Amino acid sequence: MTQDEMKKAAGWAALKYVEKDSIVGVGTGSTVNHFIDALATMKADIEGAVSSSEASTQKMKALGIPVYDLNSVDKLSVYVDGADEINGHMDMIKGGGAALTREKIVAAVAEKFVCIVDNTKQVDILGEFPLPVEVIPMARSYVARELVKLGGDPVYREGVVTDNGNVILDVYNLKIINPKELEEKINAIVGVVTNGLFAKRGADVLLVGTPEGVKTFTA
């Protein structure tokens, strides 16, 4: 089974967490694109979706899935999204696709977070994948200096502007022993919008595509 086939298996497996007549929170990325394809097969049974990125919004609209503004929605029963890394405690690094802020907002609203990945994303300790940090443009150099003080090696992601009009610093060489603590420390730096650690709001369910099929883990 190829990596993409494992992603597809995880994406389709997430359908069972979608409630009838509900509004579904939808993330961003290659694995989520498979989930969106799956969701389109039951679009008549759901009210619609809330999206974490312009890219996912466009894909869902093209498939005929109604997309709602989060401000018009009282609750989301489930949010389905991928991860760049996830550990055994359901803490994640996300934001490789630069949609981390909106992803974090939608995840905060949802009652259940279902994370869909292939088996290459499971790690013991977070940090081998560089940690994305969304930053107000004028604060980029200041924030980079503060991240160095935390032991990281920040690199400006050239040519990338987030859906919110901000920039991304990718922080290398962090061995993240306490994800919740580091998430709070980085978010406390003036000029940081948010960072890609999802530890305060981790996943509730993890669906992992493997060569043997989809494995399910719960928090």
From Swiss-Prot:
Binding site for substrate: T28, G29, S30, T31, D81, G82, A83, D84, K94, G95, G96, G97, K121
UniProt keyword list: Isomerase
EC number assigned by the record: 5.3.1.6
Active site: E103
Molecular function, one GO term: ribose-5-phosphate isomerase activity
Swiss-Prot/TrEMBL catalytic activity: aldehydo-D-ribose 5-phosphate = D-ribulose 5-phosphate
Major enzyme class: isomerase
Disulfide bonds: none
Cellular component annotations (GO), alphabetically ordered: cytosol
GO biological process: D-ribose metabolic process; pentose-phosphate shunt, non-oxidative branch
Cited CDD domains: RPI_A (cd01398)
Function: Catalyzes the reversible conversion of ribose-5-phosphate to ribulose 5-phosphate.
Quaternary assembly: Homodimer.
Family: Belongs to the ribose 5-phosphate isomerase family.
NCBIfam families: PRK00702.1 (NF001924), rpiA (TIGR00021)
Protein name, entry field: Ribose-5-phosphate isomerase A
